[in-house]
């Protein structure tokens, strides 16, 4: 029933520019409640490139995006709400900005966005992989959990059960079987319009949308798509 609700939803589709499409749907009943979903679909074949941007302080995603002259942007990974720094591995070019805390590795960080020359991969992540990537070329942002890998559901059983099972607003990045990149946000904390979803539900949503690889980026009040 949930798969049918996603496929038959009245998606509003707006072409932002060549190679970038914004899709939005309000679905009255999906995963036990109302859902509000936004997707920015990027086609790399149209010459669109992805990059990882960061700021040394707390700033709105819209401001960071404008600084980098981005067409679209999504918030990524977990941060210290007091200091504003990432608590997950963040490497931009040759600069290692932050490393993943042990707490985050235990809680949920099992994947990462790896970007090199505007091309993106979603890869598994752990402490040993992090050590190896400090010297690798390209930019990296660790996050999690990794939800899909090669079209299959990824194992998130070692992650914190409460984080996995609780419905929240969510942000995610997904690479589709067709080679497109999806920035996806699901709103939440609004019982009448958007109840939010948990990780198994988000993984299912992205699988139905044609996802091959998918990574949860963040959630809660930080969820933002620009």
Roles of regions detected by a PLM:
Residues 1-226:
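Gly/Ser/Thr/Pro-rich low-complexity, intrinsically disordered segments
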């Amino acid at each position: 029933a949930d798969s049918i609700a996603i496929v038959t939803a009245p998606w509003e589709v707006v072409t932002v520019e060549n190679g970038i499409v914004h899709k939005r749907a309000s679905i009255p009943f999906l995963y036990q409640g109302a859902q509000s979903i936004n997707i920015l679909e990027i086609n790399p074949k149209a010459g669109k490139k992805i990059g990882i941007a960061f700021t040394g302080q707390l700033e709105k995603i819209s401001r960071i995006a404008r600084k980098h002259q981005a067409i679209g942007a999504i918030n990524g990974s977990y941060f210290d709400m007091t200091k504003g720094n990432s608590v997950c591995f963040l490497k931009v070019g040759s600069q290692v900005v932050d490393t993943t805390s042990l707490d985050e590795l235990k809680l949920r960080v099992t994947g990462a966005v790896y970007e090199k020359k505007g091309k993106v991969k979603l890869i598994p992540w752990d402490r040993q992989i992090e050590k190896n990537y400090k010297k690798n070329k390209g930019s990296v942002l660790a996050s999690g959990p990794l939800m899909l890998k090669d079209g299959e559901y990824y194992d998130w059983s070692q992650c914190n059960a409460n984080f996995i099972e609780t419905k929240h607003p969510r942000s995610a990045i997904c690479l589709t079987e067709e080679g497109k990149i999806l920035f996806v946000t699901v709103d939440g904390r609004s019982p009448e319009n958007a109840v939010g979803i948990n990780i198994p539900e988000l993984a299912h949503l992205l699988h139905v949308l044609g996802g091959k690889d998918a990574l949860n980026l963040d959630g809660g009040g930080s969820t933002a798509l620009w």
